[in-house]
């Protein structure tokens, strides 16, 4: 067993903290590098293997960059508001503030035991009034700019959690947290106008160093489509409605239209005979999430309203249906159905026996099956017959425009960001309601609007804040008369939409941040976290950055220049870790047994960083053996250096061979670590230690050279095993700290060997390997191969037909 243990971890953690080794100085020499891992929620289950896989390897990358001369800023904090703490309070009676503070203290302790070089002096905790004061300031600034507004909207409502759910939080019609069936409810809510930035949010994606899949997900989520808006009038009434379509060329093929169940027009047009069926259908639709309703594989459902629309070009009557695959929040909440040229419309028409009218044929006139969804030539379309799809789009919109019934239109899938939550444990929305003045924003001088501690958590559909008279009743900042506070709190994604801006200036009491400092420090150079945040946190942070830029606070467009998603660490059974499956891994247990560096190195060697994989106890044991072997070999080398016996000063064959491995490893580890390919970097370190072990068995050694090699090995190892490497560096007699050392530089000349090993084949089978001078020409290599004793024996009595030389690699002798 080696000497490395948690005692060594503690020794160096204390020394690093005492000496302020990692304290960030923005004025220090070196190019700024802002490295950020997504901060975590301080849950009761504390730090798990997934947290470690995010934080440990990225800390190693940051250490590597620090040694390369970068001025690294790597802060840490906690995304501390949210539903779990409130649900815990309902269940146990423990106040969210108390449970959260306790969990943060434990997780800080665990993160420090990791030995990461986090800048703790820059910590942010989103539930502290010192932080959420500025979250409220952000709300007020967005409100001033018309980017925060209030409206009534249908929302996903969980009757059990008694709160609004985002579409992403509804799975198979149920709440993802408690599995209760979700319903729809009309509530007056606060929204942020993210749609004002839809074009820029989409257009700037291609300039980011982000995973392709995440970029694609955001593009799809924003969903820009260019098309036309067409107006349909309702038969026998003054009512009308618009539909958005990207295929206005198929307008003459419309055989019915479909309204979203939530479209207010439904109640105005439904016939007496169809009213009951329509009402029942609307109730069923409330139980489905928007994501489920749009599923391609799900069978389409619908019901006839009894009303008809008038086709804008033909004047024919078209039946109006209600269908839940149409969303009130997308486009106009109404679609025109062309079953001959759309798969979804075709399935719906076949199911309900509705007309299917072909209006597009293939360009080459060939017979095509329906639905035919390609571009082509118009037929059965009156004056537009014979036009191509593109020509018809122009001509039909021209005609509709002249009639006042249509126009070109750009539409987005992206909806405004709903930020109201009917919960307690979040930042209060800084607004009061006055009978005289209406909606009145709280003045900045009165921030923060603090959460009251004494509240009732019974889940009854009311925000706990609404039940606190001391909180609710206030005076209007404008007229001084009695007023009531807003009792909803902000979505926790608002807190995390700007936290990266607060870190560098977290002690500022006069402003959320100093723009001069932030514009030097930002954007974040490397951001690491899970891919599940692609369409929420990552999109919201981009929006907030752009909004603050336009207000004059920031001079950059994007918050995160480069983004990496770590993979998922699974249980030993290959399944996602969960307490119910009994397959969770507690880092603390393994750290007690092996030390933090072995745990870290196993995560970095055992898995490709962006992929992850199944945990293996055998894997961590093998990494522990590797660390013990390094210690033994370095002990041997250190003892030889200390004794000073059998020393030589020349660089002979053995020294050149070790020097080759040294520089080969420096190059490989540098390249791989830079790309976060930690597993292959550590594999190179294993090869290097083999070469070092072999050299320490030489009878005579160049001890100055050996010390240089061991020092370089420890420098390369330091980011991956920081405590162990610091200890070995110290034992070698070097000055504190290894992390103040420069990263080793690779010498290309060292990779040019005096001699190279050549394999010799006879008729394609390897018979021997020989060493030849690396600058030997082809004829010389041939001669050396043919003169080798084993080759002479293998070719005896045979005729050499030809000799093929691949320089630096092999010789193949063909005989018969």
From Swiss-Prot:
According to its record, what are the GO cellular component terms?
Answer: cytosol
This entry's Gene Ontology molecular function terms read: aminoacyl-tRNA deacylase activity; ATP binding; leucine-tRNA ligase activity
Binding-site residues for ATP, renumbered to this chain: 579
Record key words, sorted: Aminoacyl-tRNA synthetase, ATP-binding, Cytoplasm, Ligase, Nucleotide-binding, Protein biosynthesis
* Annotated EC: 6.1.1.4
Q: Where is this motif: 'KMSKS' region?
A: 576-580
Principal location = cytoplasm
Q: Catalytic activity annotated for this protein?
A: tRNA(Leu) + L-leucine + ATP = L-leucyl-tRNA(Leu) + AMP + diphosphate
The top EC class, named as a word, is ligase
InterPro entries per UniProt: aa-tRNA-synth_Ia (IPR002300), Leu-tRNA-ligase (IPR002302), Leu_tRNA-synth_edit (IPR025709), M/V/L/I-tRNA-synth_anticd-bd (IPR013155), Methionyl/Leucyl_tRNA_Synth (IPR015413), Rossmann-like_a/b/a_fold (IPR014729), tRNAsynth_Ia_anticodon-bd (IPR009080), Val/Leu/Ile-tRNA-synth_edit (IPR009008)
Location in the cell: Cytoplasm
Family of the protein in this entry: Belongs to the class-I aminoacyl-tRNA synthetase family.
Which named protein is this?
Answer: Leucine--tRNA ligase
Organism, scientific name: Clostridium perfringens (strain 13 / Type A)
């Amino acid at each position: 067993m080696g000497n490395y243990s948690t005692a060594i971890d503690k020794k160096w953690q204390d020394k690093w903290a005492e000496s302020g080794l990692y304290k960030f100085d923005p004025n220090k020499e070196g190019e700024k590098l802002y490295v950020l891992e997504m901060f975590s929620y301080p849950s009761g289950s504390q730090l798990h293997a997934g947290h470690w896989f995010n934080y440990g390897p990225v800390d190693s990358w940051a250490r590597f960059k620090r040694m390369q001369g970068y001025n690294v800023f790597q802060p840490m904090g906690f995304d501390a508001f949210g539903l779990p703490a409130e649900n815990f309070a309902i269940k146990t009676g423990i106040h969210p503030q108390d449970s959260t503070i306790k969990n943060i203290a434990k997780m800080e302790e665990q993160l420090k035991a990791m030995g990461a070089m986090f800048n703790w002096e820059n910590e942010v905790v989103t539930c502290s009034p010192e932080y959420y004061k500025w979250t409220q300031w952000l709300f007020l600034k967005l409100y001033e700019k018309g980017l925060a507004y209030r409206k009534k909207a249908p929302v996903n409502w969980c009757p059990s959690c008694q709160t609004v759910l985002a579409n992403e939080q509804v799975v198979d019609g149920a709440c993802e947290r408690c599995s209760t069936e979700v319903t729809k409810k009309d509530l007056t809510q606060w929204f942020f106008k993210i749609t004002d930035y839809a074009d820029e949010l989409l257009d700037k994606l291609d300039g980011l160093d982000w995973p392709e899949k995440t970029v694609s997900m955001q593009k799809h989520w924003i969903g820009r489509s260019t098309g036309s808006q067409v107006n349909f009038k309702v038969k026998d009434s003054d009512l009308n409605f618009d539909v958005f379509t990207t295929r206005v060329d198929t307008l003459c093929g419309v055989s019915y239209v479909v309204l979203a169940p939530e479209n207010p027009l439904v109640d105005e047009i439904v016939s007496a005979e169809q009213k009951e069926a329509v009402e029942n259908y609307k109730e069923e639709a409330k139980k489905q999430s928007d994501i489920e309703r749009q599923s391609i594989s799900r069978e389409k459902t619908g019901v006839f309203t009894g009303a008809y629309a008038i086709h804008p070009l033909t004047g024919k009557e078209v039946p109006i249906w209600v269908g839940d695959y149409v969303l009130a929040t997308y486009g106009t909440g109404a679609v025109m159905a062309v079953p001959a040229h759309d798969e979804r419309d075709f399935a719906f028409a076949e199911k309900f026996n509705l007309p299917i009218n072909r209006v597009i044929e293939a360009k080459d006139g060939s017979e095509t099956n329906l639905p035919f969804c390609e571009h082509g030539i118009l037929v059965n379309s009156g004056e537009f017959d014979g036009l191509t799809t593109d020509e018809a789009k122009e001509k039909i919109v021209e005609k509709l425009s002249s009639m006042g019934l249509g126009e070109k239109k750009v539409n987005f899938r992206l909806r405004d960001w709903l930020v109201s939550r009917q919960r307690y444990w979040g930042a209060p929305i800084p607004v009061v309601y006055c009978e005289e003045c209406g909606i009145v924003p709280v003045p900045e001088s009165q921030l923060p609007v603090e959460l009251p501690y004494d509240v009732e958590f019974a889940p009854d559909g009311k925000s706990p804040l609404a039940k606190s008279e001391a909180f609710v009743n206030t005076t209007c900042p404008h007229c001084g008369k009695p007023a009531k506070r807003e009792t909803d709190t902000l979505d926790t994604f608002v807190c995390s939409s700007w936290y990266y801006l607060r870190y560098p200036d977290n002690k500022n009491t006069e402003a959320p941040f100093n723009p001069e400092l932030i514009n030097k420090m930002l954007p974040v150079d490397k951001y690491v976290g899970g891919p599940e945040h692609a369409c929420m946190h990552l999109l919201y942070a981009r929006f907030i950055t752009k909004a603050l830029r336009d207000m004059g606070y920031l001079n950059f467009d994007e918050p995160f220049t480069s983004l990496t998603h770590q993979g998922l660490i699974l249980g030993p059974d290959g399944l996602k870790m969960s307490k119910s499956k009994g397959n969770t891994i507690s880092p603390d247990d393994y750290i007690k047994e092996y030390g933090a560096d072995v745990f870290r190195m196993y995560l970095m060697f055992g898995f490709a960083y962006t992929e992850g994989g199944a945990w293996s106890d055998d894997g961590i044991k093998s990494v522990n053996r590797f660390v013990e072997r390094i210690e033994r070999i370095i002990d041997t080398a250190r003892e030889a250096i200390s004794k000073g016996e059998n020393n030589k000063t020349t660089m002979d064959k053995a020294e050149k061979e070790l020097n080759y491995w040294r520089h080969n490893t420096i190059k490989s580890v540098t390249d791989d670590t830079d790309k976060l390919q930690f597993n292959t970097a550590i594999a190179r370190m294993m090869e290097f230690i083999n070469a070092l072990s072999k050299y320490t068995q030489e009878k005579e050694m160049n001890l100055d050279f050996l010390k240089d090699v061991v020092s370089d090995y420890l420098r390369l190892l330091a980011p991956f095993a920081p405590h162990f490497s610091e200890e070995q560096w110290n034992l070698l007699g070097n000055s504190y700290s290894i992390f103040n050392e420069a990263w080793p530089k690779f010498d290309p000349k060292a990779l040019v060997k005096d001699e190279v090993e050549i394999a010799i084949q006879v008729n394609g089978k390897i018979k021997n390997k020989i060493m030849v001078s690396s600058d030997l020409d082809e004829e010389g290599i041939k001669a050396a191969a043919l003169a080798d004793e084993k080759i002479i024996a293998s070719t005896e009595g045979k005729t050499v037909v030809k000799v093929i030389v691949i320089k630096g690699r092999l010789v193949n002798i063909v005989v018969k």
